[in-house]
Amino acid sequence: RNLPGHGTTVEDCNATKYTEWLSFVEENLAELSAECDELYVVGLSMGGVLALYLASLFPINKLIVGATVLNFKEAFKVNYIVPLVNRFIVKQKKVKKFTKNKHKRYSGYDYYPLMALNEFRKLNNYTIKRLKLIKCPTLYIHSKADQLSVSSNVDLVLNNISSEVK
């Protein structure tokens, strides 16, 4: 099963609230925890943000996150412009920033779903407030060549979680 609003259309993505994403991952981890003795949660990008949220809520044994996008490279646009315009301009054409070969492996939408991006911003703000609740051993992976996530996210996470092993 896909995360609500994902893997279908920009319109589906735009129609989804961040609370639906939280409910989905909570329900799935609760099901998994009934079958497992230990829980290791791994997430990349938005999945990393959702993994952080889960680790703030559930007794996770180990957490691995990569390229979390709690703060965006285009922070001003995401934090101030998108909340103002997302109801009027619901999608924006993507500018291809990847090389030809890298783009062939990319399977996302051709447009940024701006209403969903605004929900992602809300998810990030909510998750940042919960970082102190994370106590499990945590590995954070971030590439210096990352084109989407800023490296300051590493410090944001590692300086705010309560884990002794990071």
What are these regions (language model features)?
Residues 9-35:
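Catalytic nucleophile-loop/oxyanion-hole region of alpha/beta-hydrolase
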Residues 136, 150-159:
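Short alpha-helix in the alpha/beta-hydrolase fold that links the catalytic acid
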Residues 133-134, 140-142, 146:
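Short beta-strand/loop motif that positions the catalytic acidic residue
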Residues 43-47, 51:
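Gly/Ala-rich beta-loop-alpha elbow adjacent to hydrolase catalytic centers
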Residues 113-130, 136:
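Active-site nucleophile elbow and catalytic-triad environment of alpha/beta-hydrolase enzymes
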Residues 64-74:
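Active-site nucleophile loop of the alpha/beta-hydrolase fold
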